[in-house]
Amino acid sequence: MPYDAEILVVGCGNILFKDDGFGPEVIKALEEYFKDREKPDNVMFIDAGTGGPHFVFSLPHEEWKKMIVVDVVEFNAEPGTLRKFDVTEIPKGSYENMHTWPVSQPLHELSEKIDVVVIGCKPKEISAPNVEMGLTPPVKKAIPRAIQMILDEIGVSK
């Protein structure tokens, strides 16, 4: 499937490791939200799983104008707290995939070409390497607000 929309909403994370699955769960909730509503034609939702940094971020398309990355981010806040980050303010060392490859590098390069924002949720628990599926309660409760933040970013009123 070509990722050829103007606005991409990319959920990153691994559903096998508790709160690390926040991004994919938000994408699933967005798809559910738009089942009975008209989604803007210029917007695409992508569950990138753990492949976001390796594939989606490094394969820019000429159509792209904006990318909204949804993921867990370590920052000083209570679990379940959401924050919109500019790529330049992602705390160093706090936003890495399971192989400790810094995600900020391809995002910084991509942000030179298009508008990139990160909707970050403070995780309570990432269970890796132990497989434990399901979000913790505070992170699960953050999904509706994350959806509202994304709707605001793509210019859709609830």
Curated annotation (Swiss-Prot):
Top-level taxon: Archaea
Biological processes per GO annotation: protein modification process; protein processing
Short name of one Pfam family: HycI
InterPro entries, A to Z: Pept_A31_F420-red_hyd_d, Pept_HybD-like_dom_sf, Peptidase_A31
Swiss-Prot/TrEMBL keywords: Aspartyl protease, Hydrolase, Protease
Signal peptide residues on this chain, from the entry's feature table: none
Protein family membership: Belongs to the peptidase A31 family.
Protein's name in the database: Coenzyme F420 hydrogenase subunit delta
Species of origin: Methanothermobacter thermautotrophicus (strain ATCC 29096 / DSM 1053 / JCM 10044 / NBRC 100330 / Delta H) (Methanobacterium thermoautotrophicum)
UniProt gene name: frhD
